[in-house]
Curated annotation (Swiss-Prot):
PROSITE patterns: CARRIER, PHOSPHOPANTETHEINE. GO terms for molecular function: acyl binding; acyl carrier activity. This is Acyl carrier protein. Residues 1-76 form the Carrier domain. Keywords: Cytoplasm, Fatty acid biosynthesis, Fatty acid metabolism, Lipid biosynthesis, Lipid metabolism, Phosphopantetheine, Phosphoprotein. InterPro entries: ACP, ACP-like_sf, PP-bd_ACP, Ppantetheine_attach_site. The modification O-(pantetheine 4'-phosphoryl)serine is found at S36. It comes from Deinococcus geothermalis (strain DSM 11300 / CIP 105573 / AG-3a). It is found in: Cytoplasm. HAMAP family: Acyl_carrier. 4'-phosphopantetheine is transferred from CoA to a specific serine of apo-ACP by AcpS. This modification is essential for activity because fatty acids are bound in thioester linkage to the sulfhydryl of the prosthetic group. Pfam families: PP-binding (PF00550). Pathway: Lipid metabolism; fatty acid biosynthesis. Carrier of the growing fatty acid chain in fatty acid biosynthesis.
Amino acid sequence: MATFDEVKEVIVDKLGVDADKVTPEARFVEDLGADSLETVELIMGLEDKFGISISDEDAEKIRTVQAAVDYIGSKQ
């Protein structure tokens, strides 16, 4: 099952943000400053780390750190 810390690790790596800014309620674009390319790279990083495939439709719904954790948990 995806843990917050595992997802956080990918976010810090892909977005280059400070780990302390990555909270469950943090929004990728508004709070963490991700642009569209970084968002795609983040989704790909999560797919690689957790061995899942995230459809474009689902990716558009994943806007917060907690949403990513919940989505990954539902796919494992």
